[in-house]
Amino acid sequence: SIDLGYFFNYNKRVYVGYQSSESSDIQNVNSNFISDFKNAFVTSQFEYIDFKIGDFLFPEKTVIHLKSGIGSRKSKIDDQNQFFVQVELKHNFYLNAKNIFHLKSQNYYLKSNSYVVNELHRFGGINSIRGFNENSLQGSIFSSLLTEYRYVLSSGMYIHSIIDYGYFQDQTNDVKDSLLGLGFGFGLLTKNGLFNLVYA
């Protein structure tokens, strides 16, 4: 992918770009839902980040990231015009210096008249809905609300709860389902960044 960006200021920026990908059916199944394909999209993005000055543990107070693309996919099954939109929102609610409520929402939608499995959005794991194996889930529609109650033990250490909820649709398998992840975690600020240990 390639992007051309314009910086409004320290917090806001926009991009226009182009991205493409291809996938091969290495098992040569070539069913109605698994096939070699190539896609290409013209994309646009908006990004807003509000930083909390002096907070090295949670430097990003608010994040808004919007991305959309219009393009097409070519496969052995058929050719399709497609559109996608991706939205990620994050915000920290500071109850006081030691108690923080963290909200994060990830959302994805791919519009197409037909789908192949290997083009679907992959999710699950520590960077999306926790309690599931990394990228073990797939769908053309995915929406989630990821929450943490964070208690700061010191300037470089905190513990937190995990309550994650998600919904997805996989039209290749005619699946519509809800997901729930529960757990807890521990975060430690190191010289190399934030080390996070999670059980969910």
Predicted feature descriptions by range:
Residues 1-53, 123-126, 136-139, 194-196, ...:
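Gram-negative/organellar outer-membrane beta-barrel architecture
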Residues 34-38, 56-58, 77-81:
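Short, contiguous, pocket-lining structural segments
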Residues 42, 62-200:
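C-terminal transmembrane beta-barrel domains of outer membrane proteins
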Residues 50-52, 57-60, 71:
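Long, internal scaffold/assembly segments composed of regular secondary structure
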